[in-house]
Curated annotation (Swiss-Prot):
The record marks E27, I28 as: Cleavage. One of its GO terms (molecular function) is double-stranded DNA binding. InterPro entries: SASP_alpha/beta-type, SASP_alpha/beta-type_CS, SASP_DNA-binding, SASP_sf_alpha/beta. This is Small, acid-soluble spore protein C2. It comes from Priestia megaterium. SASP are degraded in the first minutes of spore germination and provide amino acids for both new protein synthesis and metabolism. Disulfide bonds: none annotated. The gene is SASP-C2. It comes from the Bacteria. PANTHER family: SMALL, ACID-SOLUBLE SPORE PROTEIN A (PTHR36107:SF1). SASP are bound to spore DNA. They are double-stranded DNA-binding proteins that cause DNA to change to an a-like conformation. They protect the DNA backbone from chemical and enzymatic cleavage and are thus involved in dormant spore's high resistance to UV light. The lineage of its organism: Bacteria, Bacillati, Bacillota, Bacilli, Bacillales.
Amino acid sequence: MANNKSSNNNELLVYGAEQAIDQMKYEIASEFGVNLGADTTARANGSVGGEITKRLVQLAEQQLGGGRSKTTL
């Protein structure tokens, strides 16, 4: 396994990314009808986190691939 010190923490590597991630989190929670807070279930929080990851991957794919659409095998 590679020795990657940043793999065990949630430290953001891009300055200013925290605000964008928080905005995305609340937008997605609103779309899903999830009220974020201490009383929110892990399943609801997980659905928001999973969607954030999905959208970030899509953004990265668009930037790296020049905006090409996804093809299926």
